[in-house]
Amino acid sequence: MTDAQRRAAFTHLLHSFRSSQDQAPAQRWLLLEASHVLGQQLLGLHWRSHCWMLRHALQLRDGWEVAGQLLRLALVPAGHLLDRLPRGNTGRTTVPATLPMDMPPAISALIAEALRTTRRPPGQSPRA
């Protein structure tokens, strides 16, 4: 997948998250976790995914998750600088920050759907 495809699908997932206020918190977390897994390889997207996770944790008044997201935001630059990014890690405080993970099926499905939704035929330019 190209960086442009990754960015488009990442943006789609965040849009889905912002549009999902009527869904249960667990379902909304899945959207943020999918954005983290997808965006983890690009510093800007990785940073944004943790910022959104922090924001969501603050809205839920989840102190443990807030603390974990602050720690992860501190680790993101070093992880990229040292190329120590645990592939597939969902980015939540419920899993160790350095643990590589197999992608959970629900997250894999969300990423696949985001990629399908944002795919353009070759040669077609993005809409302005």
Per-region residue spans from a language model:
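Internal catalytic or translocation cores that form aromatic/hydrophobic pockets or channels
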Residues: 54, 58-60
